[in-house]
Each structure stands twice: as structure tokens, then as C-alpha cells.
């Protein structure tokens, strides 16, 4: 089955999945995780020392990371995970300005690379963990007959929601896509720019815009929206999510334990449940 079809099927079944909560899979995998967690990442828990980790994470990771937080804290009672979500560019700026952070989980390699080149990341810890896709969405029941990214340049679209290209990775990818199609100059005159991808999603959910460009994973958890299509092949860079330890972290060992957990098969099952895939 083509990936676009997979996400369309997921979009139509998401309310059922939310009700069921992937119940049997969660029960079985969680039981396995709790049995084995002490052997895998027991250092911080064994010492009894309370640790709070601050993780700056892209807004598109909100739902899955909130689930991971609940489970990880239950298995590691002395560890508190404090997630701060936002646009990757804004989070990059926070780290550059000295905001306390232990890990950075970006929605693009650009921001991670910049911080690493500035000497603000532990280079050896950086992992390209996840891959996402960029999709065009419309409000559920839209009568605009929008069927492609090319349609955004036509009279079918009066306003489109996009991430701010200067700070929001999905906005950068959007600009790349429309530029590759030769219609960016027209599209940008119709654009309403959001501070992060979830803002764009909310605009489409409420019908404030005719369409929007978001990640497939955001569309998967969205309400009252329809996926039109994925970005044309080769129209933008591969959407990779890197994660790494901030060099100024005061809890490097605990951060390394959590980073190791994010790379386990159990954690990847969580990410895949929200539409992400492992980066290749």
C-alpha cells in the first residue's frame, strides 16, 4: 500500500484508534517494558537521586512525547521529564540564549546542525531518530475541490496556513515544495503564517483557512480535517527528526539514559503508533 494511502486510511480510522487506544498492543508492550526497564536504564533509579530533565521538543512531537513521558516516569520514579514544545527554530534560539535544557528534539536537521556547529550540543550524542512526511490538508467536508499542491496557486484557494519559514521547519519544507513547483510567488501572497505546526493544524480544523501544510503525524491526530495528498516526491528535503544532549546539561547521565530509551524498539513502537517511522 502506498504511504499516502496508509495515512488516508489512518485519517479515516483515527477516532476508532483513539477510543481503543491500541489497547492490546499497549498492554503487552508496556508489560514487557516495565519488566525489563530496570536492567536497561536503571542507573538513575537505582541511586534514588531525584532528577528533572528538560527536553525542548518540536511541536509535532507533542502527543507521542506526552505518552512517553507518562510511561517513562512510571518506570523511573525518580526522573521527571519536563517537555517544552514549540517551533524548532524558536527552541534553537532558547538554547543559544542559555535557557536550561538537557535534550533537544528537532523537527529538522538544520537547527540541530546550527547548534552543533556553535558548540552547544554533545556531538557524539546526536541521533537521526525519526522520519515524517509533509501533507496538504483541508477542512473536513471542504467544497473547494482542492486535490493537489498545485491547486493552491489557483482560485480554489483564498488563504493557506503555513508555518513561518524562518523558524518553523514545516514552513521551510512548504517553501521548498512550492518553489520546486514554480508557484511560491503566488502561494506566499495567500499565506497566513503560524508560529508552529500545531497552529496551522488548528486553523484548518476550525476552517479559518482553505487548506494548510502540516506533517502527516499532525494530520493523523487532527480533528475535522482531510488529507489531500503528500508532497510530490523530491520536492523537499527528507523530513528527519534528530535528537541529542545539550552540552550544558547538568544531568548528562540521566539524559543519556533517556536518549537510549528513545532508541529502543519499545519507544519506536510508540512513535510508529503516531505515524512516524524510523529514520534511514
Q: Whereabouts are the PLM-identified features?
A:
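Short, glycine-/small- and polar/acidic-enriched structural segments
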Residues: 126-134
Amino acid at each position: 500500500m502506498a504511504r499516502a494511502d496508509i495515512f488516508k486510511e489512518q485519517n479515516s480510522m483515527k477516532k476508532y484508534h483513539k477510543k481503543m487506544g491500541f489497547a492490546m498492543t499497549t498492554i503487552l508492550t508496556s508489560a514487557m517494558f516495565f519488566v525489563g526497564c530496570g536492567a536497561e536504564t536503571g542507573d538513575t533509579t537505582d541511586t534514588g537521586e531525584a532528577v528533572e530533565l528538560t527536553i525542548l521538543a518540536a511541536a509535532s512531537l507533542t502527543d507521542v512525547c506526552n505518552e512517553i513521558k507518562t510511561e517513562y516516569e512510571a518506570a523511573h520514579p525518580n526522573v521527571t521529564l519536563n517537555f517544552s514544545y514549540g517551533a524548532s527554530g524558536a527552541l534553537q534560539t532558547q538554547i543559544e540564549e542559555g535557557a536550561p535544557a538537557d535534550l533537544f528534539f528537532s523537527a529538522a536537521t538544520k537547527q540541530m546542525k546550527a547548534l552543533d556547529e556553535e558548540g552547544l550540543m554533545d556531538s557524539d550524542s546526536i541521533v537521526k531518530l525519526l522520519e515524517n512526511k509533509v501533507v496538504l490538508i483541508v477542512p473536513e467536508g471542504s467544497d473547494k475541490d482542492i486535490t493537489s499542491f498545485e491547486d493552491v496557486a489557483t482560485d480554489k484557494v483564498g488563504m493557506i496556513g503555513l508555518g513561518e519559514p524562518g523558524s518553523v521547519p514545516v514552513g521551510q519544507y512548504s517553501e521548498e515544495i512550492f518553489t520546486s513547483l514554480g508557484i511560491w510567488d503566488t502561494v506566499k501572497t495567500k499565506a497566513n503564517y503560524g508560529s508552529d505546526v500545531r497552529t496551522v493544524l488548528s486553523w484548518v480544523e476550525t476552517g479559518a483557512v482553505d487548506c494548510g501544510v502540516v506533517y502527516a503525524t499532525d494530520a493523523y491526530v487532527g480533528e475535522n480535517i482531510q488529507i489531500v495528498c503528500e508532497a510530490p516526491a523530491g520536492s523537499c528535503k527528507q523530513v528527519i527528526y534528530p535528537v541529542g544532549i545539550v552540552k550544558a546539561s547538568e544531568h548528562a547521565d540521566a539524559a543519556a539514559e533517556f536518549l537510549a530509551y528513545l532508541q529502543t524498539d519499545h519507544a519506536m513502537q510508540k512513535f510508529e503508533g503516531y505515524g512516524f517511522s524510523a529514520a534511514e
